[in-house]
């Protein structure tokens, strides 16, 4: 499928999350054609994916190190740089790449298949839980606390608890007591 066809599909797609994931899949394909790695969806868009759109954000946050390649690809499909965001007026879409990589070499990612050979990578749920728990604890973000509890209730039996606890004790996170309390509260 050609780039213009994918852009038309994105424009016609009703689900905001599916539109975002299709855009990341297109970016992934274009970057891989340049022998570059796939970007990884992080932040609110990843939270929207795992919460099944209980939470929604209007922008796409990506972890990607090669800003030059990403900028070139975004420009080639009609995005314009506006401050820290790349904006596509026609698609009413905004992309930001606030992180150059995921936290740690062993950070898992979920690869989402979208059909027609399109796929995108999303931060692993354990790292997303830690990220949102940090926002809840350190920035006093109530919604992030609620979303962490929702994720633990929904995915608790499938989470990699040793990995989560290993990440939670790192000095930059310091969220082990919160993780253990949430685990207890949801009955795991």
Question: What are these model-predicted stretches?
Answer:
Residues 1-188:
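Compositionally biased terminal segments of proteins
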């Amino acid at each position: 499928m050609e780039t213009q066809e994918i852009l038309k599909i994105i424009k016609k797609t009703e689900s905001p999350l599916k539109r975002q994931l299709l855009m990341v899949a297109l970016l992934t394909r274009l970057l891989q054609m340049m022998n570059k790695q796939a970007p990884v969806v992080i932040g609110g868009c990843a939270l929207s994916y795992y919460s099944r759109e209980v939470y929604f954000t209007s922008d796409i946050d990506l972890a990607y190190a090669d800003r030059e390649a990403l900028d070139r690809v975004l420009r080639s499909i009609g995005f314009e740089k506006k401050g820290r965001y790349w904006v596509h007026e026609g698609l009413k879409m905004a992309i930001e790449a606030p992180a150059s990589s995921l936290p740690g070499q062993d950070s898992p990612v979920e690869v989402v298949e979208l059909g027609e050979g399109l796929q995108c990578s999303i931060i692993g749920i354990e790292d997303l839980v830690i990220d949102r728990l940090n926002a809840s604890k350190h920035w006093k973000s109530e919604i992030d606390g609620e979303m962490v509890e929702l994720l633990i209730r929904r995915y608790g039996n499938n989470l990699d608890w040793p990995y989560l606890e290993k990440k939670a004790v790192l000095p930059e996170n310091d969220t082990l007591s919160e993780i253990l309390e949430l685990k207890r509260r949801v009955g795991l």
